[in-house]
Amino acid sequence: MSALNLTVRVHPVVLFQVVDAFERRNADSHRVIGTLLGSVDKGVVEVTNCFCVPHKEHDDQVEAELSYALDMYELNRKVNSNESVVGWWATGNEVTNHSSVIHEYYARECNNPVHVTVDTSLQGGRMGLRAYVCIQLGVPGGKSGCMFTPIPVELTSYEPETFGLKLLQKTVGVSPAHRPKTVPPMLDLAQISEASTKLQSLLDLILKYVDDVIAHKVTPDNAVGRQLLDLIHAVPHMTHEQFTQMFNANVRDLLMVITLSQLIKTQLQLNEKLTFLPTA
């Protein structure tokens, strides 16, 4: 498969590790680089982990601790044997002159390595994320070179990662003095209420976007339109009475599960107290 047909999917933990490595960099380091770990399947490069590689960049050369990178990879293989080298990352919003030299090393470690750049300067208030592959250029018998070509990149996450991100969002904007050290699990009904409130706010946002497009206040985006059409087609066709009946049945089932779980919890607590009662 051609390298240009690859798509990169990056997990949140990778971005957290990149930012952490950037914050811990040496004072004389302008950027940080590291190894990307993950898997490749059917043209999709899924990046699930990474680590930093110490290096120094000079005007005419790059010094990287390759032995450190090899040791880190071997240690990671003992814990996550399904993760392999898929490319490398660097902080910044552009490809530098030294990028081709670093890419040559990773080209020996894996087939079609990808290069991901993370803009930790937060230009425009966003963390820019880009992915590249290196395409060989040249003529037979002449000089050859390479060119970094952008490829699609997107963020993805497993369900536990999504849940963790939602918990982190609750502490955004909270001062350290008032920030809770622990986040207790929410009750089932509280989770339903919170999810319903968020769904209502998202629906209001979509309706506002559609109204602005109809009023020619916003330039329409074909990709957004196709996604909205897919959402409409995904909604099951049923009457209001059928939906109400189905919703009420699910709520009754949920309440029954909550009641039974509370009874089991009470029984376990009572059994624990009876077990530790002093015997005459």
Swiss-Prot record:
The answer on whether this UniProt entry bears the keyword Cytoplasm reads yes
Cellular component per GO?
eukaryotic 43S preinitiation complex; eukaryotic 48S preinitiation complex; eukaryotic translation initiation factor 3 complex, eIF3m
Domain called MPN: residue spans: 8-138
Going by the UniProt record, its keywords in alphabetical order are:
Cytoplasm, Initiation factor, Protein biosynthesis
Q: Does the keyword Transmembrane helix apply?
A: no
The cysteines covalently paired via disulfide bonds are none
Instruction: Cite the GO molecular-function annotations of the record.
Output: metal-dependent deubiquitinase activity; translation initiation factor activity; translation initiation factor binding
Q: According to the lineage, what is the superkingdom? A: Eukaryota
GO BP term, example: positive regulation of Notch signaling pathway
Pfam entry (one): MitMem_reg
- Family matches, as SMART domains: JAB_MPN (SM00232)
**Principal place where this protein is found?**
cytoplasm
Q: Which InterPro entries match?
A: eIF3f, EIF3F/CSN6-like_C, JAMM/MPN+_dom, MPN
Q: Where in the cell is it found?
A: Cytoplasm
Main function:
Component of the eukaryotic translation initiation factor 3 (eIF-3) complex, which is involved in protein synthesis of a specialized repertoire of mRNAs and, together with other initiation factors, stimulates binding of mRNA and methionyl-tRNAi to the 40S ribosome. The eIF-3 complex specifically targets and initiates translation of a subset of mRNAs involved in cell proliferation.
Quaternary context: Component of the eukaryotic translation initiation factor 3 (eIF-3) complex. The eIF-3 complex interacts with pix.
The family annotation for this protein states: Belongs to the eIF-3 subunit F family.
Matches recorded under HAMAP family: eIF3f (MF_03005)
Protein name stated in the entry: Eukaryotic translation initiation factor 3 subunit F-1
Q: What is the originating organism of this protein?
A: Drosophila willistoni (Fruit fly)
